[in-house]
A protein has these predicted regions:
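N-terminal helix-turn-helix DNA-binding core of bacterial DNA-binding proteins
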Residues: 16, 23, 27-67
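Amphipathic alpha-helical recognition patches that constitute DNA-binding helices
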Residues: 13, 44, 95
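Charged, amphipathic alpha-helical coiled-coil/dimerization segments
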Residues: 26, 76-134
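Generic C-terminal helix-cap and adjacent flexible tail
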Residues: 141-147
């Protein structure tokens, strides 16, 4: 006789597995980002800016799935530390663009060790991580579409 998994059993919940993995990532990243003097959300801001310096605040929020009420204080704290600067768009003054300062750009070299440490900790093949990341992107897209 086979028993069907209880759909309300915690360990059978996909959402709990993702939630628990998120917490494990946070614990793993914290000491590494503390050494850089930044938090995980700030790290994400830098990752976007290292790809697209001069992006608008709105585009940054869209890229990170965060609203302006979350992005603005994050950006202001980094600006106060001299790691980035905000500037009104020359063509549309309603838009604010975010630019890295030399100090913010310089943080990239130190941050390169973080994803390398993640890869080491996860072990396995790079393709495994790529496949998992793609599955998680698809999961987010499907949940967004169903919301």
């Amino acid at each position: 006789m086979t028993t069907q998994a209880d759909p309300l059993r915690l360990d059978s919940m996909l959402c709990f597995a993702v939630y628990a993995a998120g917490h494990a990532f946070t614990r793993f990243y914290k000491p590494r980002l503390d050494a850089l003097g930044i938090t995980y959300p700030q790290y994400l801001v830098f990752m976007v800016l290292w790809e697209a310096d001069g992006i608008t605040v709105k585009a940054l929020g869209d890229r990170l799935f965060l609203d302006s009420g979350t992005i603005t204080p994050l950006v202001k704290r980094l600006e106060a530390r001299g790691l980035l600067r905000r500037q009104r768009d020359d063509e549309d003054e309603r838009q604010v663009r975010i630019f890295l300062t030399p100090e913010g750009r310089g943080l990239r070299a130190k941050a390169l060790a973080v994803p390398l440490a993640v890869g080491e900790a996860l072990g396995g093949e790079a393709a495994d991580g790529d496949a998992l990341r793609e599955s998680l992107h698809l999961l987010r897209q499907r949940l967004d579409a169903a919301s």
